[in-house]
Structure formats: C-alpha cells, structure tokens
Amino acid sequence: MNKQTQTMQIYQVIFQRGDYVSVETYKEFEYATEQYEGIVKIWKSKPNECEFIKERHEREFGYFRVAEFTNGVKVTIKTDTLRELKNRIKG
C-alpha cells in the first residue's frame, strides 16, 4: 500500500444540536429532541488535524457544521468557527 494513501473509516452518527458526540460509543442521545444523521470520516493519516467534513445545514433555528477530530474522535455541531470549536473540545 502506498504511504500517501489515506485510510478512512466512516461512522454513521446520530447527534443532537449543540452536543458532543462520541462516534465510538454512540451514547448520550436517548434524551435528544432534535436529531440529525451524519457521516463522520476519520482519516488515519491525519492524527492531529481537525477539518470540516460536511457543509452547513440551514434549519429554522440556524446554521450547523460537523467536524471531525481524528485525535479524539469527537464531533460537535452548532458552531460558527473552527477556533470556537477547538476551544470547546478539550481533552
């Protein structure tokens, strides 16, 4: 396999607006009132990077983005900037 080839794992995730999501356990969602399904792509070749993998979703209550954190494998939505998102995810 070529070293430059990127391996990818894809997870199906159900997440609630504003919540932190663990794609490894899929927990924290039994109380959700608004749920959305999304695809989370985990790029093994980028262990410390975070990038947005889904475009914004316009709803009656605002704009949302999905981000992947390959180091911690966590996802959140309802944030305007990557900086804000990084500040919210700690450890």
Question: Where in this protein do the model-derived segments appear?
Answer:
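Short, mixed-charge low-complexity intrinsically disordered segments
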Residues: N2, G38-G91
